[in-house]
Amino acid sequence: MIKISLKNGKEIEVEKGLKVIDIAAKLSISLSKKALGAVVDGKVVELNYKINKDCKVEILTFEDEEGKKILRHTASHILAQAIKRLYPEVKLAIGPAIDSGFYYDVDAEFSFTPELLEKIEGKMNEIIKENIKLERFELPREEAIKFMEEKNEPYKVELIKDLPEDSIISFYKQGDFVDLCAGPHVPSTGRAKAVKLLSIAGAYWRGNENNKMLQRIYGTVFEKKSDLQDYLKLMEEAKKRDHRKLGKELDLFSIHEEGPGFPFFHPKGMVIRNTLQNFWREMHYKADYSEIMTPIILNEELWHRSGHWDHYKENMYFTKIDDGNYAIKPMNCPGSILVYKNDIRSYRDLPKRYAEMGVVHRHEKSGALHGLMRVRCFTQDDAHIFVTKDDIADEIIKVIDLIDNFYKIFGFEYFVELSTRPEDSMGSDEDWEAATEGLKNALKMVGLDYKINEGDGAFYGPKIDFHLKDCIGRTWQCGTVQLDFQMPEKFDLNYIGADGEKHRPVMIHRVVFGSIERFIGILIEHYAGAFPAWIAPVQVQVMNITDAQADYVAEVAKTLKENNIRVECDIRNEKIGYKIREAQMHKVPYMIILGDKEMKDKNISVRSRKEGDIGAMSLEDFILKLKEEIDKKISHV
């Protein structure tokens, strides 16, 4: 008998050699029916995996992210099998699970159309009904190469040839179809109850623009058709909220072929941007941060010293000035370090909190660019805090509180992940353990639940990631808090302690918005372009019913401007209903409508974007009401 430790802390004894599915059945019949795989001692495995020793076991269902990945991965194989049944000459590349579903990259002499996707989806449903078993088998590397060459799959051959010579290569067979794959998978195709092919895009083989452009077919899968329908409705809503579409309609920003990945902000977009930055400055001033600004271009030697050259070079841009080599900064931290080093520091000076709205440049492949969400130039709201080791926990708690206050203002809920040491990192095991424990302790002290995200930390330290949940349930990773023992060592940072000796500070890196550009993109989609009054580019639109009120419109607008309210006037010779509809289309929070009666009574008629007609009131009362809404930053979605 062997001991199995379960997720809930309980232990059970089972016979040696039992499969994961058998263990699930011992726990409950309903669990065994829902099970898609398991995590055994930290490794994700399939249901047929045999257990031969004491271990920890967590059964995975579609409610678990890893469970979703298993089913999505199997769905990508079903897609590939359907394509090969219909078009045997098509060459297969890769087909992974992704956050919202799966895709498969294929090389075909023809273009896939929406009509062809329907045909492929129909064939996928046939394969699902057949409930074909997925069976794993392995071959030595040379045999695997020959096997794929015989199947005329050059992309698979290339992948195998990249593996070490002594590799054992795994494949999955489902009926007449075989694919190169490490797994895991569900036991049979019938588990993918509800599939949908969503779209087609171009993708360079291995993400390299010098390679052939393949066709990428995206899809998604669920266990229930009702869940698929809910997801498709969500996708329709997301399309309506697409920040690229709304950004154009509301005249907020544009992106041009002269600068792919470099957004142009229009006047109304700049109002939003400046409003967010002013709010950021106000919050940081109250939290005792000092704002700095550091250069965009710095000598290449600095990036060698910081470690960015070794760990981030592929994402950087470089230039020459005179005879020197320089880099355009991808991160702000080395600049903050130079400011810290500019003076002798005492323990009495710490914590030293430097905040910066720093413009950074990072190379992204053209296929990855996406509106404001994925760009090559953006403004990062960085702060770098230099603390003593004794102050780490207190300072991280203050940072978490600041981030929490920020997100509440916008009406966001969030969840937290703790990202641990990646493979490509620097520093000792001891430093990484100390930093990771420091973050865990801070999260425990503030009572925040969190998930561990293995291997996704920065190259210089572990981090806490804040994932915002928008009003239609999507999540966006924005804020981060990183604890860093490495940079202070590399740059020989110190402070004079109470004992008169030099000591090494610890560095905390953190962002709240993350990227201002991306945060604006998220807000556009979160609010569907209907920004709260305090953020809205135009807070009030004043309009007349006839030409007789034109001067009164100008008078009302002047008073609003004097009270720092953002206002536009509409005195066009158009019907008032048309003007109101247009203001609604532009998502202006308030409209002031002026006719003969309002002009005679020296008052105004107010209409709200949200509530409709509010009625007549004095201009003074309206200003008081609106200024209170703006000052309180009321942000109802």
From Swiss-Prot:
Stated role: Catalyzes the attachment of threonine to tRNA(Thr) in a two-step reaction: L-threonine is first activated by ATP to form Thr-AMP and then transferred to the acceptor end of tRNA(Thr). Also edits incorrectly charged L-seryl-tRNA(Thr).
MF GO annotations: ATP binding; catalytic activity, acting on a protein; metal ion binding; threonine-tRNA ligase activity; transferase activity; tRNA binding
Protein's UniProt keywords contain Transferase: no
SMART domains: tRNA_SAD (SM00863)
Species of origin: Clostridium kluyveri (strain ATCC 8527 / DSM 555 / NBRC 12016 / NCIMB 10680 / K1)
CDD domains, per database record: TGS_ThrRS (cd01667), ThrRS_anticodon (cd00860), ThrRS_core (cd00771)
Protein's cellular compartments: Cytoplasm
PROSITE patterns, per the entry: AA_TRNA_LIGASE_II, TGS
GO biological process, one term: threonyl-tRNA aminoacylation
Family of this protein: Belongs to the class-II aminoacyl-tRNA synthetase family.
KW Repressor (keyword) present: no
Domain TGS: 1-61
Entry EC no(s): 6.1.1.3
Known partners and oligomeric status: Homodimer.
Signal peptide: none
Gene3D superfamilies in UniProt: 3.10.20.30, 3.30.54.20, Anticodon-binding domain (3.40.50.800), Bira Bifunctional Protein, Domain 2 (3.30.930.10), Threonyl-trna Synthetase, Chain A, domain 2 (3.30.980.10)
Catalysed reaction equations from the record: tRNA(Thr) + L-threonine + ATP = L-threonyl-tRNA(Thr) + AMP + diphosphate + H(+)
Short name of any one Pfam family annotated for the protein: tRNA_SAD
Record region (Catalytic): 242-532
CC cofactor note: Binds 1 zinc ion per subunit.
The protein's enzyme class: ligase
Keywords: Aminoacyl-tRNA synthetase, ATP-binding, Cytoplasm, Ligase, Metal-binding, Nucleotide-binding, Protein biosynthesis, RNA-binding, tRNA-binding, Zinc
Protein name (Swiss-Prot/TrEMBL): Threonine--tRNA ligase
Disulfide bridge map: none
